[in-house]
């Protein structure tokens, strides 16, 4: 398996601040089942391989991500859940700038547990191939009490993607109490990520 720059599992009171991270062989910062975390002032460039994410939060609770600059070949900041009895809860993402050859901020697609009490604000998105914000529940997750306020996207494929599905026959998930406010997006005629060395998959 390709190594990540940070792979933190089952930890609490985690603080990562003012760190410059460059071109992991895999995901950039990956946190699994952690709680009470602060990620602040990170400068992440992670484009060495086509599916390199910037920050991945998997089944984490009480997390603050702020004042980060993320430039990734895959999703910028991604919330995932592999544990049906857990999920991501009480996550705040604010004051960040993101470039991505996939989605800037994404829920899923791994979505067995839930995504609850998520706050996203003051996000600047540039040169992003897919979505400024993608919310997906395809493995049975309950996505609820989500507020995204103040996302400005330039040269981005689309502003918002939401998907509710039953991948591999799992129970259908739920999307409820989701608020999107003050979302502005400029969508280009051509590819928004044309300056990237590695791109997401082509569509036909």
Model-derived regions, located:
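Extracellular/periplasmic carbohydrate-active domains that bind, remodel
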Residues: 1-204
């Amino acid at each position: 398996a390709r190594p990540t720059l940070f792979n933190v599992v089952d930890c609490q009171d985690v603080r990562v601040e003012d760190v410059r991270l460059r071109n992991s062989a895999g995901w950039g910062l990956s946190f699994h089942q952690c709680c009470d975390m602060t990620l602040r002032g990170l400068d992440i460039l992670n484009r060495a391989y086509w599916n390199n994410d910037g920050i991945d939060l998997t089944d984490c609770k009480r997390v603050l991500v702020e004042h980060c600059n993320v430039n990734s070949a895959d999703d910028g900041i991604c919330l995932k859940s592999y544990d049906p009895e857990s999920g991501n809860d009480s996550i705040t993402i604010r004051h960040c700038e993101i470039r991505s050859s996939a989605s800037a901020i994404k829920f899923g697609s791994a979505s067995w547990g839930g995504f609850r009490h998520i706050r996203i604000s003051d996000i600047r998105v540039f040169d992003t191939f897919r979505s400024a914000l993608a919310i997906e529940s395809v493995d049975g997750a309950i996505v609820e009490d989500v507020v995204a306020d103040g996302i400005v996207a330039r040269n981005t494929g689309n502003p918002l993607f939401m998907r509710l599905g039953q991948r591999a026959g799992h129970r259908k998930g739920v999307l409820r109490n989701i608020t999107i406010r003050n979302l502005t997006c400029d969508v280009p005629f051509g590819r928004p990520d044309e300056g990237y060395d590695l791109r997401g998959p082509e569509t036909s």
